Amino acid sequence: MSPHISPSKDTPSQRLPIPLSLPTHLGLLAKAYGVPPASILQLAWGLVLRCYFTTSSSRWGTIDMAHEYKEKKNLPIRCEVLELDDTRSIGWILQNWNDPSVHRHLPAEEDTSNVPVSAGSIVILTEDAKDLEVLRDFELTAEWIICFSTSTEKPLLRLSWRPDVIHSELASHLAQLLERALDTTFLSPDIPLSQINLFSILDHQKLLQWNHQYPQSVNRLVHEMFEDMVAARPQATAVAAWDGEVTYQQLDRLSTRLAIKLQTIDLQPESIVALCFEKSVWAIVAMLGVLRAGGAFLHIDPKHPTARQQAMISTTAARIILCSEQTRDTVSRFDSESLSLVVDRKMFAQEPDHKQVALPSPNNLGPRNAAYIVCTSGSTGLPKAIVVEHVSLCTSVTAQAEAMAVGGESRILQYAAYTFDVSVGDVFTALTHGACVCIPSDWERTQDLVGAINRLDVNQACLTSTVASFLTPMNVPKLQKLTLGGEPASKQCIDLWSGKVALKNVYGPAECTVWCVIQKNASSEIPASNIGRGIGARTWIVHPENHNQLMPIGAVGELLIEGPLVARGYLNDAERTTAVFLERAPSWLATFGPLPPQTRFYKTGDLARFEQNGTLFFEGRKDTQVKLRGQRIELGEIEYQIQQACNPVPPLAVELIETKDLQAPLLGAFITWTGGLEISLDQSAVPNGLGPDLDARSHFNELVSRIQANIDRTLPPYMMPGLYIPVQKLPLSTSGKLDRKVLRQYCTQHTRSFLTASEAESSDVIADDATKDDVALHEIVNPGEITLAQLWAHALGRRMESINAKDNFLSLGGDSLAAMRLVNLAARDAQVTLTVANIFESPVLADQARLLRPLSKTKSLAPFELMTRGEASIEDIVGFAAQQCRLLPAQIEDVYPCTPLQEEMMRDSLSNDRTQMGQEVVQISEELDLVRYQVACASVYRRFPILRTRFIEHSGRLVQVVVREDLCWKQPTSLAEYKALDSRERPALGKPLTRWALTSDGTHFILSLHHAMFDGITLGQIQGAIYAVYQCIPLPPPSVSFATFLAHLDDQNAPLSQESQRFWQSYLCPSASLDASITPETQKIDRPRASCGTQRLVQFTSGEVSALQRHGLTEATLVRGAWACTLARHQQKPHASAFSDVIFGTMLTGRNFHLPGVDMLAAPSLTHVPIRIRIDEGDLNGHSARALLARVQADATAMIPYEHDGMNRIRSIEVQTRAVFNRIRTLLVIQPIPEGLTSVSTSPFPGSIVSGPRVEAKEMGHFHWYGLLVECTLLPTKGFFVRVSYDNKMFGTEQVESLLDDYSTTLHTLANGLMDTDIPASLHV
């Protein structure tokens, strides 16, 4: 019903006369209040618009032919505005009709195409009914027109509409509403507007047709429905998780054993058990075990701030907490007397198997007992704990399974966070209907969802529109059914999936047990806001301020849910329960048939309207509750926590906003700086609250810092405001309420920087010379600083205007990967040199700018140049290489040396059973054009020399040979057989080290390649290039060649330089206590072989990350320092001392020098070096965290010039140094996610990676020769994924698990130590 006047005249309008049942009353009422009859009509139309748009301000366009516009040509359209205050009566409004605060009109517009009207309507007034005939052109162009002849003899009222825009049934309904509004105006001029009800008999008939049947209640226990499936499908897979699979029978036995254990500690019905788990099969065992023991479960997010976790425990009085080994440390920090139990394999290994023991039925447990509790945010700062009963959950999963076609063949993705009620629907809809719950790891959930969906064979998923938009149908070919829920679906997402899957759009607040409304046939033809019909519930639309008043069909009102799936209420909170859960049925319910027993109603606070076919159209929220990225957020809770940090408390508001330059919604906190409120009649822009006062800016920034520090401890990350916006006043509506719409509109008109006052008008901000001098202290002034600020902005993804001369690169979020980007941007775009060491040693922009030097031109290398610097000729080199590779000399493209690590890896695979070969297996989508796919692969094969590289031995050393050849495909008939044979094929000198295969049925692509041929960045380049060529996306010019890279390294055959030897002797100089061994001497072996593995996810809190940035430290530094502390704590020292020296190996990216394009080098640049760190006693408890991590980072920076010296050459320096290497038993690898290195490499490929070079942890022994490897992949989500492989002859499983537990604890200990430490003076801005 949005307004506009369309120029189209293709569709003739339709007309409907509206009878005036009381025509004489019109004149009498007009005379009584001294207004024209037309004013009464306009008031009635305003009441109709108010009903449809739930606004106190109604607008429409008016053409008044009764006065000066007798020409009937170029008729001006005037915008009428009518303010309708609920507390006023119809008579009062007519009496004050000429008061501008009640009724006013904007100046007439000559151009009728730009009429600013609401509801797309034009009201035409005339004294002569004949004049209406000249208005046919208007009837052809406006959506609808109300024509009114005020003739005293025979008043005439007519509705015209365009049927291509307005449905005839809706038009007829509008005509009836207008007729009813006029009758109400005539007969009840003295009643308040709030009591006017336009609901008609026709509306009642339609609602009776849609809601005649009360939903069937399923009066059972949830676990009884699960037990039905155990009996029917005992060997079917119930849960397929990243950490294990269980059948229905196995899940039955595990949950029974847990239930029996819980019953032994006196768990009773209505007792609440808190669950604190990462994504895991054991979380499902815990949920089901609690239910079968008779209790109710409550999920707690292990990543949320401790204060919020504690509030949930306190609110629910949970006296038992079930957790995992990974979350045990989190639970131990709770200030609670609750008993905590770790649920994992160890628990069931220690407990007897009760498979033959019947589970005792809990006393008095019935369908009306609590099944689970879910907490949502609350406006008082405390979470609201919703109590959902068994009957509600059973009714809900039964209705959902039918609506979503869930059955024994369904493999349902469990994506939603456990604290989100959708997870309960995922799990129990599946387990009560014989389906399989598919659970990715937390890392897969955020970093590789496509891969997880394909690896788990998911065919059904429920996702938010945002997440679903990240996927494409081509990439998840097995996904057959997709449900969008948790937030309003976007049209773009529906268009993406429409016709590709069975698409559904659902709605449901947590108080109504997951989903209660569903659009079963979502498609591009149906508006995204159409959420369908109720399931397991009846739906009603009531007046937003009075639930005893039904709204007419098509009018916007509050959505009211009725049925057995409505929750019991809020735990121990009668006041808030009474406010939204109705104790009594509304008075109108009896008119729709016999009252159902124990019916429940929930006032959702959501605005919606009925379409003419009975489906619901979602319109938004009526209060301060919003949804962001699927999370339900009470804005009042955020406002409350901000207020706790402010003294005195200024007027403030938090709103979900979009800015002019950022289209993704985010939370904005509006804080009044001058302190005040103002009435907003014209909805003008909100004035910025700081203006030219630079002192005010400084104080405001201090306030924001204080707020952030406070809410970081009390609110989860998804509730953190993304913007803090200073304003002079908050706008109010005429009713005195905060006008949130004005705040939202204000943000859409300005950029993010302008809103936060960091982007100001320079002429306005700098008020006088003194102020200019103050600004100049931080202002970027010289060309070097300007150049560097531009490079920083690019490397960090910031606006240049937000960077000043005293900013710290690390404090702005820079890390080693960002530093590498900066080095290469400097060389490529500015032709200046900058090293990673420069960046870490001088992180402040002004200091860093002084280190910039002009870049010397990189000399391009001729083929074979690196091999002909001695006595050998090109002919000799080419001939020898051709002979070794069994090729023609013309096929030899280039020959150059290896990196130290390449030679190390290749020689290891030649002399041992470690092949160093990785296999990437891709499942091909049916939609893929195989010919085009193979052409793309062949093109990439020719583009990247590393794919055409072989190794040969020349003069006692290995060198690499680039050959000219086309891609040769293998076509195996069996994937499994090929993988087995290929993995056993040993690499050899002179032979290809990449193998390409496509199964004969075209379903799988297998790329095998030696680890000496790639690193993470190279692999990303290859994958991205294949995708780009397939999609006809132009590739960027080739980056620096591998030969040019090698030319920048020292001669790897020559001894180390004196400078390098001095560095390594000093760095590795052992002390008496040096011993990084964590294994007994009897367990040490010469050539360890890792054959076992484990993995886990470690998350940093936003406070820990902020502390790192404030101290100018990187996450990689924390990871390295914590590992050193862990080794020190576990090592077997020869004697007691106050400190320990630890040493371990590590892999570095090897791209930390100023060679233009090195960040895009498509070749392995990794380097292998030892790391030695001295650990003092204070380092182990976090008391000297900053000092320790500063040493670790300084040592890493100092090592940069020498990191390519190579482990073998370092080992050969002297006997004392060689002895150090005998103590190295562990390898730490830190893998940053290569964001920003190439946009192409992040693009999804049509297919799914089944397995790849990032093999399972236990299989990583094929790629290294350490007894223990710890690989930490840094994640954009502020944490890292740890994979460990180990030789079980050197390390026991319990020992490794203990080591990892200690490592995780140490990471948080050091990070928390930083939070309690002052920022060093060198980092103050």
Swiss-Prot record:
NCBIfam families in UniProt: AA-adenyl-dom (TIGR01733)
Protein name: Nonribosomal peptide synthetase
Top-level taxon: Eukaryota
Reported cofactor(s): pantetheine 4'-phosphate
Region of interest (Condensation), residue spans: 893-1310
Gene Ontology molecular-function annotations: ligase activity; phosphopantetheine binding
Biological role: Nonribosomal peptide synthetase; part of the gene cluster that mediates the biosynthesis of the tetrahydropyranyl antifungal agent lanomycin that acts as an inhibitor of CYP51 and blocks the ergosterol biosynthesis.
Alphabetized Gene3D superfamilies for the sequence: 3.30.300.30, ACP-like, Chloramphenicol acetyltransferase-like domain, N-terminal domain of ligase-like, Nonribosomal peptide synthetase, condensation domain
One Pfam family cited in the UniProt record for this chain: Condensation
UniProt modified residues of type O-(pantetheine 4'-phosphoryl)serine: S816
Annotated GO CC locations: cytoplasm
Entry's Gene Ontology BP terms: amino acid activation for nonribosomal peptide biosynthetic process; secondary metabolite biosynthetic process
Enzyme Commission number(s) from the entry: 6.3.2.-
Domain Carrier: 779-856
Keyword set includes Ligase: yes
Database matches in InterPro entries: AA_adenyl_dom, ACP-like_sf, AMP-bd_C_sf, AMP-binding_CS, AMP-dep_synth/lig_dom, ANL_N_sf, CAT-like_dom_sf, Condensatn
Keyword Amino-acid biosynthesis tagged: no
Membership in a protein family: Belongs to the NRP synthetase family.
Pathway the protein acts in: Antifungal biosynthesis
Domain notes: NRP synthetases are composed of discrete domains (adenylation (A), thiolation (T) or peptidyl carrier protein (PCP) and condensation (C) domains) which when grouped together are referred to as a single module. Each module is responsible for the recognition (via the A domain) and incorporation of a single amino acid into the growing peptide product. Thus, an NRP synthetase is generally composed of one or more modules and can terminate in a thioesterase domain (TE) that releases the newly synthesized peptide from the enzyme.
Keywords annotated in UniProt: Ligase, Phosphopantetheine, Phosphoprotein
Gene that encodes the chain: ORF2
Organism: Pyrenophora dematioidea (Helminthosporium dematioideum)
Region of interest (Adenylation), residue spans: 248-644
